[in-house]
Amino acid sequence: PDTPAVAHQTIEAAIAKAKKLYPELPLFAAGKSFGGRMTSQCMALHPDATIKGIIFYGFPLHGPGKPSVERAEHLKEVKTPMLFLQGTRDELAAWNLIEPLCTSLKLATLVKIDGANHAFKAGKQNILQLLADSTNEWVMKKIKKG
């Protein structure tokens, strides 16, 4: 992956381009793993950003086998709603750490994906459809709220 500075610049450019192309539409930012974490870091640095929410597909809370919540310290600075889609077997986000973290963030919603790892592998379940449906439901609620 890129450095955080490069990732932040890329995210800012993507948001600016989307706002320019579709100024009338509500804008949500999403990322898988590092992309989601960099998006939330960027939004913590720019709380005035006009996105309606951030969607995390497997937030990388810590390195494999190194349980910690340090990577999430910036989340309390994020001023927009956040959706965390997390597997219970995610090797980069121990469930016993990610669940209380999300509970502590008043703007966070956590969707538990039983048996899924960081790549959202969970046997024969159709996880992609679950991710899409959960995202759609959350986004529609946020749009209706205004």
Predicted regions and their residues:
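A conserved short beta-strand
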Residues: A49-L61
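Conserved alpha/beta-hydrolase "acid-adjacent" motif
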Residues: E91-L97
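Catalytic histidine neighborhood in serine/cysteine hydrolases
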Residues: S104-A119
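Short beta-strand/loop motif that positions the catalytic acidic residue
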Residues: V78-K79, F84-Q86, D90
